[in-house]
Structure formats: C-alpha cells, structure tokens
Amino acid sequence: MQNTKIGIIGGSGLYDIDGLQNPTWQKIESPWGTPSDEILTGTLQGVDMAFLPRHGRGHVHSPSSVPYRANIDALKRLGVTDVISISACGSFSDDIKPGHFVIVDQFIDRTTARESSFFGTGCVAHVSVAHPTCQRLSQACQEAAVAQGITAHCGGTYLAMEGPQFSSLAESSLYRDVWGCDVIGMTNMPEAKLAREAELCYASIAMITDYDSWHPDHGEVDVKEIIKTLKGNSAQAKGLISHLPATMVSEQANCPQGCDKSLEFAILTAPEMRAPALLAKLDAVAGRVL
C-alpha cells in the first residue's frame, strides 16, 4: 500500500486551486529542465495534493514550449501517484457543447516539435500506451464531475495538435469526419506518454470551450468567446477538484491496470551498456526498475 498523492496539471484558465490546507509553492529541481512553474502543495480533505500550472502562472509557455518532461519528473519527485490533466479543448460533436467536460480515454498524437520520451540512446525502453489513461482514475474524475453537477461525457478521443495556431477547416473536418475524434487540444501529448513512462496513473479532463472550425453555425475559433467560456469552466474545474478526495482512497494498492508497473519489462538496453549520464537523469522516473 502507498499513500495517494494527486497531482493536478492545470491548463489554460486554471492557474491555482482552492481549499488547500497548508498551501505552499515549492520549487522543484529536475534534471530534465525547469518545470513550468513552482508546484503548489497541500492537503485537501486529508488527501495530499500537488498543483502545477502547465503554462505557468501568467500563461508564459506556449503548448510547444511547455517543459513536459521536467513537469512529469518534478511531480514524480514529489511523490505524486495520480496525475489528472485539466485542459481547454474544442469539440467535434454537437452533443459535446461548450461548458461540458469530457473524460478522455484515447489520443491521436499529431505533435511534431516536442521531446516525447525520457528514454533514448544509452537506455532504450518501449512502454505500451494502448490504453493511455487510467480507468480507475478516470472513473474517480467522472464521479467528481457528477457530484459538481457538470455535464461530463465518459470516454472520448483527443486529437493532440502542435499549435499554437488553431485548425484549418480542412483539418477540422478530417479529424471529425474521417478520424472520428471527439475533442481537440494542444497539450495532452506527450504528457500522457511521459506519465506512462514514469509509472504514474494519468487521467485527462477536457473542458470544452468551442467547436474548433468545423461547425457551420459557429464559424472559426474566437479567442474572446474561448476566454469567456474558460472563466465558467475554470470555476467548475475547481469544484470538481474539491470533490476528488471523496472519490479516491487515501491509500491504494497496485493500480489494477498496471500503470504503476509499466516499466516492468520495457527496458531493452543491456545493463552493462546503459549510459551512466542518462541513468542519473532517470533516478526518479525509472528508479524502481533501475
């Protein structure tokens, strides 16, 4: 058994959380670079919490420049067991409206300019991301959303685009009509893959702000409208977070899905051939198996 520690990665419009006891902003050093910001730690209804604003307070990092590896490594160093991503997204469905939330369970990764793995030359590893989110943690998020009175859709495919520009009409139509995606965003990849490499349970909550550019009745993405919707979504997200402790146990056994054992047989490089410099950087992420 280990103590549950929830790590919240807040996206656009969500730069802190309410109700923490003994709140402290901590600067965490990482060999993978400087995290997006200091991490807010404390307890919420007896459960240890950590909050990291993905873009930094004041929104200083674009989706492409977010230090994803440093962020996940820093949360791991803090002892986080469960990572919940909350991010602003567009919708590809009339049924998924602005103000709704989607508990994402699949991704299509279209990012092109980001470091997507902790591993590489000197220590090669291959983890499975067939099911990239944790079912147990996603269910807890769904229950917390319902408790907050949020319209939350259970399951959906997230198209991760590079950005920072929004989609063209042709791209939006492709993702919706041909690929069957449900939502679109710019930040959950490689974040979800890195969380899996770090043996962290990961869940993704998409806060819907717009219809991307496919919808004939809504036109192209309007940043002013996004910001307006974000304010309401952020308040709802904070309410959802306040319900999380009631949906999760303070101590947990091994993840039923095996998220916490994802590196068990993943490293292929022979021990005598592993690069010491890379192994030193992997002390938190892969220390259990190294």
Segments the model singles out, each with a brief description of its role:
Residues S213-K261:
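His/Asp/Glu-rich mid-to-C-terminal helical/loop segments that flank catalytic regions of hydrolases
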Residues A147-D182:
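Active-site/ligand-binding-proximal alpha/beta "capping" segment
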Residues M186-K224:
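Zn-dependent metallopeptidase/amidohydrolase metal-coordination segment
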